[in-house]
UniProtKB/Swiss-Prot annotation:
Similarity remark: Belongs to the ATPase epsilon chain family.
Leader sequence residues: none
UniProt xrefs under Pfam families: ATP-synt_DE, ATP-synt_DE_N
Protein's UniProt keywords contain Transmembrane: no
Protein name: ATP synthase epsilon chain
Membrane-protein topology: Peripheral membrane protein
Taxonomic source organism: Shouchella clausii (strain KSM-K16)
Primary location class: membrane
Single GO MF descriptor: ATP binding
Gene3D superfamilies to which the protein is assigned, alphabetical: ATP synthase delta/epsilon subunit, C-terminal domain, F0F1 ATP synthase delta/epsilon subunit, N-terminal
Compartments, as annotated in UniProt: Cell membrane
Region (Disordered): 81-110
């Protein structure tokens, strides 16, 4: 099957470079599946995992919003923050999830910010499960 080049880039530099038969990202409109020769597009990303599938194996990167740019031969994910599974401190992510849940349980809280923090923590915990996969 044909592959497409993939780059995940943050302000701190490249987090992932490789090729995949299928790239799946979470946009603000829903999940988007991308294969080689996809029509060009740019879309804002939501917090979630970026998944790269090749030869039946899947790699993931936790993405904290940004944009995806798709060209027929390349996918660029420009993210505010992104982490590979081996970079994620699961204990720190678990504590961040607990803090976000506590904030959401209180009355005087910026709900949108707390919900975003909760989603980031959950995404990081889910992606961390793919360490060594």
């Amino acid at each position: 099957m044909a592959t497409i080049q993939v780059s995940v880039i943050t302000p701190d530099g490249a987090v992932y470079e490789g090729d995949a038969e299928l790239v799946v990202v979470k946009t603000v409109e829903g999940e988007l599946g991308i294969k080689a020769k996809h029509i060009p597009l740019v879309s804002p990303l939501a917090v979630g995992p970026a998944r790269f599938i090749k030869e039946g194996k899947e790699e993931q990167v936790a993405v904290s919003s940004g944009f995806v740019e798709v060209r027929p031969d390349h996918v660029s994910i420009l993210a505010e923050a992104a982490e590979r599974p081996e970079q994620i401190d699961t204990e720190r992510a678990r504590k961040a999830k607990e803090r976000a849940e506590q904030r959401l349980a209180s009355e005087h809280v910026d709900r949108k910010r707390a919900e975003a923090a909760l989603q980031r923590a959950i995404t990081r915990m889910d992606v961390a499960k793919h360490k060594g996969a």
